[in-house]
């Protein structure tokens, strides 16, 4: 029988429940157990695919094409386990399933209600993930904060779930809460935690472990106070103070004994964790030998979480290259409207590498094109992802081929030279949600290319999220001016990778390599991009 760990949050949102779940998953896996994770999001959207990145952060794409919450990315990176569509479920998805069953007559004319029908659907999904994953331990994160109206069905479902498992030792509840510091009085306050736990207990859930987030060390006497008022053992009050890196969190939690408490409470054999690789990783991250600066040119830079996996992939590559990656955030809109060469130089001149990530819509696109031209002409390492690659194609068409009206039909439907066009199979699609080219597809790389050298193999599988592609009608002319197609989808001759001939490192990819990077196994393209940026930096001195 699998074991289930339910993780809830209190006081405020954004405390790091996902990092807590991911870190604990890593610690349990390091003891030789199979783990997986499931995130419940209480919003009514069926998935985050159509949500604004500025509101929600990035959409993480799984191998099977699931458009998921960014916490699923944390799960994959920390646990080094591929997740799928089923590992992120929203209220919208639960209600859609229940309503579809009602329309089919599955409820035999019964009155469909939140209890038991919605809660049963939630519990059914938890069991399905357990069966499909064959994991020993399933970590289930409940999004939002205890007390939110939207989250009530999920909390009720997990309360019921505990009463339905064969043994009470099969379920454990962890509550992540805030212990704020009040500067005026110079004190850490436990009252918000007490009230949050009281709210949780009022619906029938008694936490077994309380993880206390704070910006500083929590003294022993305050931990004992929380234990007393919240009815948990003192050792089950786990401090989780701010650290220099996310990757330090598993080691900090191991030091506090979280995994041992969890294993003991769930009746799992105590095993010695194998964290040597993770410890070495953290040490390299804390003591880099050099620095490199990357200009990240995007339209969603107001919220850094919109590019979370890109940032983490840069960090992974930096760790591998013994370098601290400093990101210079550049709003692509500020590079538009006839920006002068001097202003462009002032904005991008200090960069050792320029990265243009994915995105949608025309806003900011001209600024991205200006940044790409700057990288191409100055010989600065460039990495374009999804729209970043498409922007590189438009830049080459305009400034090397002389097609001044070159554009994407995403922005100008009747443009004179549509060097980027909608994929044929997308032209009849009307709904936006879940209809893009999603998930992992093969790509065949050309030997001798930088991409082939990075991967060390001819066929790779990468994750996608797009509707538009390079228009092959322009490919021969683009290649004639130096923009080479060095990677294609074998089944449809779709251009997946382009490189600029004669440039030190200029690579654009249609896929999203950031979704497959791991702290201990950086993505080959990010690894080589940072290496090229370091070489460029060394050459400037």
UniProtKB/Swiss-Prot annotation:
Binding site for L-glutamine: 359, 387-390, 410, 467
Pathway the protein acts in: Pyrimidine metabolism; CTP biosynthesis via de novo pathway; CTP from UDP: step 2/2
Matching InterPro entries: Class_I_gatase-like (IPR029062), CTP_synthase (IPR004468), CTP_synthase_N (IPR017456), GATASE (IPR017926), GATase1_CTP_Synthase (IPR033828), P-loop_NTPase (IPR027417)
Root EC class: ligase
Residues the record lists as binding ATP: 14-19, 71
Keyword Cytoplasm annotated: no
Subunit details: Homotetramer.
Role summary: Catalyzes the ATP-dependent amination of UTP to CTP with either L-glutamine or ammonia as the source of nitrogen. Regulates intracellular CTP levels through interactions with the four ribonucleotide triphosphates.
Protein name: CTP synthase
Organism encoding this protein: Symbiobacterium thermophilum (strain DSM 24528 / JCM 14929 / IAM 14863 / T)
